[in-house]
């Protein structure tokens, strides 16, 4: 009996040992860590994918440019009426000339033009270059800028879908230009817009190249190749901070007066005033090889 009991104990012990070995988790096998995907690097094409060299005469090329029309104040209490007349926007001597005039126009006492490429030149990323000479005088407010082609985000078109101000200039601050971005989270109406300024003493006497570099990770603004403002996209941003992953179109205009341009009043004796544009060129964003 004692031998039988001892045999049973030995068998039970062996069985328990085997069971523990069977239940034990497998020993992990060492593996090399998965390599991180390096961020993509980009550059811009050497040749423009869209351009206007203004090597013709007459109205701006209708295949490339449309007009915003009217005298609604444009959300900024502006004083001009925008028209599509030759007197306010014409091409001659190799340049586009946008002219603000003191004259009765619609319900307003000033006329001007606001050109846009919507539906004719809409871009997602790339580099935009505009070579221009600006008007002068208190009350003028020229701009080179972009807006969203479609309303993709939020409950209202602006500012939810973004604005990129490549160049803004106000006549009461003659030797300086500004670049800004506007989004739902960052915009001037709530005092949170992001931007910068730089001195350009000859802005109204010489031509300068105003440019925007637009990549998935940032937008950067420059004058004559000298960057003076950059706004970076971050992983924490959503569309309210960074709606700039959808197409935008270009606008060129001169406003008169308004909430910013008219802060020091409007000098009635300076008109007509013109912004001359030598060329507009848009380069495509491509991956570096």
Model-predicted regions and their roles:
Residues 1-29:
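Bacterial Sec-dependent N-terminal signal peptides
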Residues 19-289:
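GH16 jelly-roll
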């Amino acid at each position: 009996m004692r031998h039988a009991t001892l045999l049973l104990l030995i068998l039970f012990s062996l069985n328990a040992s085997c069971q523990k070995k069977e239940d034990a988790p497998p020993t992990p096998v060492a593996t090399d860590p998965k390599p991180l995907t390096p961020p993509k690097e980009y550059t811009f094409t050497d040749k423009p994918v869209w351009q206007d060299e203004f090597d013709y005469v007459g109205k701006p090329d209708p295949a490339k440019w449309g007009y915003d029309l009217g005298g609604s104040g444009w959300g900024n209490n502006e004083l001009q009426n925008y028209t599509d007349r030759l007197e306010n926007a014409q091409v001659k001597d190799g340049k586009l000339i946008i002219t603000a005039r003191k004259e009765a126009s619609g319900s307003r006492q000033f006329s001007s033009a606001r050109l846009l490429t919507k539906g004719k030149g809409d871009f997602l990323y790339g580099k935009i270059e505009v070579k221009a000479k600006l008007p002068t005088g208190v009350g003028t407010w020229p701009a080179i800028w972009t807006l969203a082609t479609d309303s993709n985000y939020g409950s209202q078109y602006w500012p939810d879908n973004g604005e990129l101000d490549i160049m803004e200039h106000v006549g009461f601050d003659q030797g300086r230009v500004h670049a800004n971005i506007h989004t739902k989270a960052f915009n001037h109406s709530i005092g949170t817009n992001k931007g910068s300024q730089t001195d350009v003493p000859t802005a109204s006497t010489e031509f300068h190249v105003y440019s925007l570099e637009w990549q998935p990770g940032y937008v950067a603004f420059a004058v004559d190749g000298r960057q003076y403002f950059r706004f970076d996209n971050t992983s924490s941003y959503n569309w309210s901070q960074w709606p700039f992953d959808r197409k935008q179109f270009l606008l060129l205009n001169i406003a008169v007066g308004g909430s910013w341009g008219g802060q020091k009043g409007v000098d009635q004796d300076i008109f007509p005033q013109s912004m001359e544009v030598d060329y507009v060129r848009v380069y495509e964003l491509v991956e570096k090889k």
